[in-house]
Amino acid sequence: MATDFRSSFSASMRQSMPPVGPSVANQLPNINFGFDDLRDRMAKFTARFDAFIEEGRKRVLDERNQFRMNVAELQEDQRMKKRDIEIVQTKTATHQQTIEKEKAETREMETAINSLASQRDNHLSTRDSLKAEIAQTQAEIETRLAAQREYAQHQQSQSRFNVPELDFWITNLCLKIEGAGHDDRLKFVYTHVDEKDWEREAWFELVTSSRDYDVKHCRPKVEREKVEKVLDKLNESRELVVLLKGMRELFVEAMKS
């Protein structure tokens, strides 16, 4: 219906319009719009636009890669910090356990101190009653000590001149005597103490600076309590062979164990 209306309207308009002269389009001048130049500029624009797009795409890719690297670094930092936190937590827990242990030990020490203080008070209470008895026995003790010192000096002076006996024990105990780097020390070195290796050596250093002899160092290690027992026998008898035989027995026992 709309089509019929437009057709009838166009026909009526043609009938009502007066005739005209030549066509206006034929009278327009011939104008050169420069389509070739426009096409060339469009091509250049397209090339620049494509280059811009490519550069933008490359920049976006670079930024995305950089972003991924930054994220990876942040994740690694987070992992390291988490590990550091775990280490700190472990150390904190260990430290707390140590503190608790020290507190328990402190309580035990306080209990022991209180017990010792009580014992001390008991000893102090009986001290006055013992003073009289101590005074009575002091003279006797001094007399006995003087006799022991005299005997010890005599034994020591005799032992210095008993070289043949010392040579005998050196030979029979597979022993040699060396200097220990100090004027008041002697080093006694044994062999044939290890059944698996007769050449293996065992030694100890004897300190002679005081009246009572002492052993400072020995290899292999032996129990100090056993060494003290040997030293007690030596200091009581003042016979060096007691020490030489006793220490060799301790070394043989240590090698077997």
Curated annotation (Swiss-Prot):
Residues 57-143 form a coiled coil. CDD domains: RWD_Spc25. Keywords: Cell cycle, Cell division, Centromere, Chromosome, Coiled coil, Kinetochore, Mitosis, Nucleus. GO terms for biological process: cell division; chromosome segregation. Disulfide bonds: none annotated. It is found in: Nucleus; Chromosome, Centromere, Kinetochore. Residues 1-15 have a biased composition (Polar residues). Pfam families: Spindle_Spc25. InterPro entries: Spc25, Spc25_C. GO terms for cellular component: Ndc80 complex; nucleus. Residues 1-23 are annotated as: Disordered. Component of the NDC80 complex, which consists of NDC80, NUF2, SPC24 and SPC25. Belongs to the SPC25 family. Acts as a component of the essential kinetochore-associated NDC80 complex, which is required for chromosome segregation and spindle checkpoint activity. This is Probable kinetochore protein SPC25. The gene is SPC25.
